[in-house]
């Protein structure tokens, strides 16, 4: 192991450019994502040892190469991985429109958590619509069902109609 480290340190400049080039080409393939993370760990491990042993110049170089290596790789890895949850997130929001509430019940609770976060970004929409709706829903005996029902209605009608409609229908 001690023999490998200096060679890796000397080659860190080439390692950085080679690994980022590889990831630019293969970053989107899931097979390479795992190996990329492995090489990233090895890469960081080698660089962690280098600044301690090496001179000040070497330390600077290692720090620079890690940044150069980590940023493009994180962008390459982050995009496909971030895209999927986002896509799933929107699919989860859209799906309650079509299936019956019985199917949405399981999702209803988790969806309500997500929708709070999503609608919290549009304060007028989310808080204006949610806060009045949720208080009467919790007062009722069917707390979870009410919350889920108002949720699906808000998504179906876009919030405005369900806000005026659901509390009156409940009462």
Curated annotation (Swiss-Prot):
Modified-residue entries (Omega-N-methylarginine), positions: 42, 48, 107
Positions of post-translational N6-acetyllysine modification: 122
Modification Symmetric dimethylarginine occurs at: 107
Basic residues bias: start-end ranges: 1-12
Listed PANTHER family: MYELIN BASIC PROTEIN
Family to which the UniProt record says this protein belongs: Belongs to the myelin basic protein family.
Record protein name field: Myelin basic protein
Species name: Sus scrofa
């Amino acid at each position: 192991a001690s023999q490998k480290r200096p060679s890796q340190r000397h080659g860190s400049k080439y390692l950085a450019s080679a690994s980022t080039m590889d990831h630019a080409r293969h970053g989107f393939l899931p097979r390479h994502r795992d190996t990329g993370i492995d090489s990233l760990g090895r890469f960081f491990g080698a660089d962690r040892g280098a600044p301690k042993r090496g001179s000040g110049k070497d330390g600077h170089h290692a720090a620079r190469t890690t940044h150069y290596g980590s940023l493009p790789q994180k962008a390459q890895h982050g995009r496909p991985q971030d895209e999927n949850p986002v896509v799933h997130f929107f699919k989860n929001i859209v799906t309650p429109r079509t299936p019956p509430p019985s199917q949405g019940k399981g999702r209803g609770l988790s969806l309500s958590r997500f929708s709070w976060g999503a609608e919290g970004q549009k304060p007028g929409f989310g808080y204006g619509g949610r806060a009045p709706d949720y208080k009467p829903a919790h007062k009722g005996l069917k707390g979870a069902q009410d919350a889920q029902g108002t949720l699906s209605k808000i998504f179906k009608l876009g919030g405005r109609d369900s806000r005026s409609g659901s509390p009156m229908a409940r009462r």
